[in-house]
């Protein structure tokens, strides 16, 4: 009788495991949320998503647009503080995502050297949970839509790389983790790749 009882319990547990996929040991990929601020071009969003998914072998999700936070606005220069946007993104990030990338068409800035408010294309802390990119400065000097998208994909991949722990690359001049030094033309010279050295550095943080 006891043996029959034990057998029935085991059967119930096995059925329960099957129904709830408890035996599914498929590794979960790193999850990244892409958060548009305000109206943002859909074609650029799709390309950004495809770019970061491909380079980092992750799964990203485009969220519904939200307004830029008022507390990040810097009235004297009519732009938004990137560090404030990053903190805001970190606060609102859902636990289901490992990182969150904010994208905007508005100008963004940060404090750099002797400049209190320095206009930038993107910002990401190393390591970090959130980063932000803007097409406002990226679009300057572009010859067509394809050129703009290529530049912005590199910017977002670069800032996300900082979140994953990467420093500016000094090993390969074609690696997109090279420092742009504030120049969009530097971004154009880089390939949309991570060099082998950078790849090895983040292998342990990506699933």
Model segments located where?
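Active-site-flanking alpha-helical
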Residues: 161, 165-166
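Fold-level signature of zinc-dependent metallopeptidase catalytic domains
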Residues: 25-43
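Metalloprotease/metallohydrolase-associated module, dominated by Zn2+-dependent proteases
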Residues: 38, 117-151, 167-207
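C-terminal motif of bacterial Sec signal peptides marking the signal peptidase cleavage site
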Residues: 13-16
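Metzincin-family zinc-dependent endopeptidase catalytic domain
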Residues: 45-155, 167
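Sec-dependent signal peptide recognition
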Residues: 2-8
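Conserved phosphoacceptor histidine of two-component systems
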Residues: 158
